Amino acid sequence: MDKITLEQDKKGEHSILFLLLGGLAILAIITGLLTNYKNETLTCSKSKDICTVEKINLLNVKSTKNLVKYSDIATVGFLKQKVKGNKYAKGYSFYLLTFILKDNNQKEIFKSEYYEKTDIDKDIANLREQIENVNSDIVTLKREY
């Protein structure tokens, strides 16, 4: 059996520790790339009676989620919520774009927040105009980050 000095043993422990930390860092980066989205697109089809949200993450992988039936939508609105966080974030609000359904429930459209009231007002006006337009079959809204 070979004898290992104390210094060699400590070097081995350090290299294993660095490998583990490096592996965890790589996993964290991959998780971030897969779960952070660079854009979301709402698409509603009046003829198919469905609204879907397509999300594209930082690796350009698309995922699609069925949101609601188009016939259940009454109007478009927003939810105002307080920013949670440290003492510097107290008092600030963010807004979530929602569909107000015919049964008065709200269904969140995008997972990302709007921090400016003017931005969400523009998107609400755009969506309401498209929904009220009788001639168009498709309603779309794209949100990029």
Label every model-predicted segment.
Residues 2-5, 100-145:
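Terminal and domain-flanking low-complexity segments
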Residues 5, 9-16, 52-115:
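Non-transmembrane, membrane-adjacent beta-strand/coil modules in membrane-associated proteins
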Residues 22-27, 45, 51, 66-70, ...:
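Activation on folded, globular domain regions of eukaryotic proteins
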Residues 1-43, 144-145:
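Alpha-helical transmembrane spans
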Residues 33-37, 41-46, 81-90:
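DNA polymerase processivity clamps
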